[in-house]
Amino acid sequence: MKWEKNMVYFGREQAWGAALGAGLGAGVGMASGASKVGTAALSGAGFAAGMKVGQLAEMPTPVAILTVMEAEKIDVGVLLKQGFIDALGKTSTLKVVGDDEPADAQIQLTVAEWGFRLTQGFSSVIYPTLNVVAQMNRGDEMIWRTSEAVTPFNGQNVYGYTPLTYRTDPEALRRALTGITQISGRYLVQELK
């Protein structure tokens, strides 16, 4: 299982930045960090896992989400691996063995991209996203490879919340990331058949 903790984030503050800067460089507002306007708009945010009140509100949204994930031990890699194993156990004849046990093939799951995105320009709700590459090797031979993306437009992705919710409700964040990793696990196992 491989995943980078670098998150892709495109929320309302980035949409506003892109819209305002369209004539002079549309990409200005699309940086991963929230703008000062976006940060100020979210200044009512609370705290998580011992953070001082307002401390999360001062952070750009992506940094605040990563801070909550770290404090609450929410690991996309662990969630994805479990979602894949659960889906495999329900629908496949393949047997999963422990990491240190001998196997006739190895499956590598790699999170190519993950984060949060809007469904439309100025919505107040962002949805978790996940793009996973799965590959099965037997020795040096690749015998299967696929990728699956869960986007805000996926009908099963019902885990949209406001940035404020993701900042202040660790269980909503956990529920959203667990949900999309389970969706991804099911899709990947369907491709494996």
Regions inferred by a protein language model and the residue ranges of each:
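Short, solvent-exposed, polar/charged sequence segments at loop or secondary-structure edges
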Residues: I65-G115
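Surface-exposed short loop/turn segments
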Residues: K5-G21, G29-A34, G38-A40, K95, ...
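A structural "domain/chain start" motif
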Residues: M1-L80, F84-D86, V189-K193
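C-terminal/domain-edge helix-coil "capping" segments
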Residues: I74, K81-G83, G89-V96, I143-K193
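A generic structural signal for ordered alpha-helices
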Residues: E58, P62, L66, A112-W114, ...
